[in-house]
Amino acid sequence: MPSVPSDEEFLTYNRGVIDEFRANHGVVTQPPFPVLLLTTTGARTGRRTTVPLGFAVDDDGRVYVVASKAGGPKHPAWFHNLRANESVTVELGAGSFEARAVVTTGEERDRLYRRVAGDDNAYAKNTDRVFPVIVLDGVPTPASGMHISQPQKTG
């Protein structure tokens, strides 16, 4: 079973991805799939925090992310933040957009999750929790070259 990175490992990795993303107008070398930057407001602190996340696009052109935290036992902090305040900022490519984070449920959640996890649900094998799927309402459909067409994992 693959190990889940520590919080410090996540922070160090994320800082590098964020810096590269902003320096190159949304293009990064790692991870090996398209990413966006999600900025949430801290539920307790009120401080704005940014994380890089893999994303997917559904058939209706909606951009969404999965709160997997690499299969860790707890939801990522950014998910708790957007549950407290659904207003988020999304950086995608060279653009920045104000959006509303909508946590999906039931059949919609399951359908969207299957699109990114496919049959290889390795992250889910590490934990008993259900990974939340969040639609970022207000983010325009990215250019076709940024679509994730194969199952990918998100942060």
Where do the PLM segments sit?
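A short, polar/charged loop/turn motif at coil->beta-strand junctions and beta-hairpin connectors
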Residues: 29-32, 130
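N-terminal short leaders/motifs
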Residues: 1-12, 40-47, 87-96, 142
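Short beta-strand segments
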Residues: 32-68
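Short, structured beta-strand-loop surface elements
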Residues: 68-132, 138-139
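Extreme N-terminal tail/first-helix region
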Residues: 1-30, 143, 155
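Short helix-to-loop capping/linker segments positioned immediately adjacent to catalytic or ligand/cofactor-binding
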Residues: 25-26, 45, 121-124
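C-terminal edge-of-domain segments
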Residues: 2, 122-155
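Generic, well-ordered alpha-helical segments
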Residues: 13, 30, 46-47, 70, ...
